[in-house]
A protein has these predicted regions:
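Beta-strand/loop-dominated core regions that host nucleotide or nucleotide-derived cofactor-binding catalytic loops
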Residues: 62-107, 113-115, 121-159
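N-terminal intrinsically disordered, low-complexity, charge/repeat-rich segments that act as generic
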Residues: 1-60
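Generic short beta-strand
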Residues: 46, 119-120
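Solvent-exposed alpha-helices and their adjacent loops that cap or buttress functional pockets
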Residues: 39-41, 111-114
Length: 159
C-alpha cells in the first residue's frame, strides 16, 4: 500500500464517520495522530488503529463499530448528549467492566439514538465507561424498567 492509497482510505473512512456520527466526527476520529489502516484479504479497509488504541472497525455494512479510543475521541469532541447514553453510580462498575447497560439504569440519552447506533456509555459525572451498540430507541431506554439498552463491546477498565 502506498502513502497515497492510505490517504485515500483515510479520506473515505472520514466521510463515512461524518455520515454516521455527524460533521464533527470525521476530524475527531481521524485528525491529529498517525493512523494505521489494516485490510482484509480482499484489500478492503478493516481496522483503524491509533497509538492510543482501536478507533474502530469498518464493517461490511459500511458503518463503523467503535473501539474505546474512538469512543473517547467522540466523547471529547461531540456536544453533549450526542451519541451518548448516561448511567449513574449503581451500574458504573459493571459497565466499566464490559457488562451490558440495562434500561432501568439509563439516566439520560441522546434523543436521536436508534437501535443499532454506536454509542459511548458515560457516567453522569462525564467519564467514559464503555462503547457499544444501542439495542433500544432513546425513548424506550428512558421509559423501560427491563431490557438491555446497550450491548457493550469494550469497557474502559483503564480509567
Amino acid at each position: 500500500m502506498t502513502d497515497a492509497d492510505s490517504g485515500m482510505d483515510i479520506d473515505a473512512l472520514e466521510r463515512v464517520a461524518v455520515y454516521q456520527f455527524g460533521s464533527a466526527a470525521g476530524s475527531a476520529l481521524f485528525g491529529g495522530s498517525e493512523l494505521d489502516v489494516t485490510r482484509s484479504t480482499s484489500g478492503r479497509p478493516r481496522q483503524v488503529l491509533a497509538p492510543d488504541g482501536r478507533i474502530g472497525t469498518y464493517s461490511t455494512t459500511g458503518r463503523f463499530t467503535l473501539g474505546l479510543a474512538g469512543g473517547r475521541r467522540l466523547h471529547e469532541s461531540l456536544p453533549h448528549p450526542d451519541y451518548r447514553v448516561v448511567v449513574g453510580d449503581e451500574s458504573e462498575p459493571f459497565v466499566r467492566d464490559g457488562k451490558n447497560v440495562f434500561a432501568k439504569f439509563v439516566q439520560e440519552v441522546d434523543p436521536d439514538v436508534r437501535p443499532g447506533d454506536e454509542v459511548a456509555v458515560v457516567h453522569h459525572e462525564g467519564d467514559l465507561l464503555a462503547v457499544g451498540r444501542a439495542e433500544l430507541p432513546a425513548s424506550d431506554m428512558l421509559d423501560f424498567q427491563t431490557g438491555m439498552a446497550v450491548a457493550v463491546r469494550d469497557g474502559a477498565t483503564d480509567n
